[in-house]
């Protein structure tokens, strides 16, 4: 079912002997008076349950499965399914044996991407800078929006409430750099850091698993007893870069605000098009109407964000056989 609209109006001294990753204080330099640079503030939205939540909110017992070595295994399960004993890693057959009424959905990265894009569209009402930072992470730059939305606390509450209303269980964090905000959110630290000088302290206990670094790098560091960002920052810089590559050091410096971290802002297409993929043929009118209403709500968010209207809405119903049915 597709609906579209027309165009709108991270110390091992035996291995390292250089300076630690924490930079030494530079010699004081004469100050030149310049216009103050605009401070950034990044709001990160991490969606750890996106594969389950992408298909929309629901109270029923559900599980998302993914194929692993030829076996379909549970990736995520809803609260009601978990209460019945369904856990990630179980085979789909074992899950159904525990709960025959369990609704199983195959993971769809397309549906997840669409849900993330819909969320990005909704976030554009708060700021013009919306960035994708992974398959389950969105970043918005909010420094310029604070006054308009009643300050940081008010803006955070509005975004958090909107996410909950749309059925998303998000981990949120705010920091002056996009990477710091992302690592804090992925580490489950619901932090709000406004000063760059406080980033290192906030990141100290964040586990390396939250950094999205290669597994081999994290395993090698863990073998040395390095398990957090704070552990990494105590290592000598040159030795760290030589052993693990300069990119990891660059990422740490970007997270701490020592290096710039430019991001590309995402813009929604001018033409709205949304679809809903059914797992099987359906003739239930009430179900189809509910799906249409969900698509219309997505359109409403798209239009309200841009203060636009549309003159025409087209629904297309694709059948297993035969041509599509279109309802203008």
Give the role of each language-model region:
Residues 150-193, 247-254:
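Structured, non-catalytic alpha/beta "coupling" segments that mediate domain-domain communication
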Residues 79, 84-86, 198-234:
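Amphipathic, charged-and-aliphatic alpha-helical interface segments
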Residues 108-109, 186, 312:
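Charge-rich, low-hydrophobicity low-complexity segments
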Residues 23, 42-44, 98-102, 218, ...:
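DNA-contacting surface of Y-family translesion DNA polymerases
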